[in-house]
Amino acid sequence: PNLTEACMLTGMPYREDGWSKADFLKMTDKLRELGADKIVISGLNSTSYITNVVSETPGEIKFLRQKRVGKVRSGTGDIFAAVIASDCVNGYPLENSVKKAAAFVRDCILATEKRDIPPTDGVCFEDVLYRLKV
């Protein structure tokens, strides 16, 4: 889930910032109680970076950062999740998949900005789809 969805699922109050590692450990514990095994909390925004929280083992989390590019666009979360889901069914390691998905979304945003597409029209993933080939 993204942060908003994770808050809704766990009953934790949403806030824009001020999240600690302990907060995310608590959140991933609550998501595990709901049946999740491996967890990605996507799209934590800061001025310069997008961060994804990854937890494959109870009590452990990693923060994977990607340089922020372009405008906020519709559909990026769906693309991010689709790359991870595809890799998951193909046995690809989760941490590597999250890095791959974040890089792919970044490339989609850059390709879309180049075409001057309005942010509400999503992203031009077709231009960079070939980069997902294994």
Question: Residue locations for each model-derived region?
Answer:
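Phosphate-handling active-site elements
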Residues: E60-K62, D87-A101
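Glycine-rich beta-alpha junction loops
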Residues: E5, G43-T47, K67-G70, A101-R106
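Short, small-residue alpha-helix embedded
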Residues: M8, K71-L94
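Generic structural signal for well-ordered, non-membrane alpha-helical segments
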Residues: S20, F24, T28, R73, ...
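Short pre-catalytic strand/loop immediately N-terminal to key active-site residues, enriched for Gly-Thr
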Residues: I61-G75
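Conserved phosphate/ATP/ADP-binding segment of small-molecule kinases
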Residues: P1-I61
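Charged C-terminal helix
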Residues: E95-V134
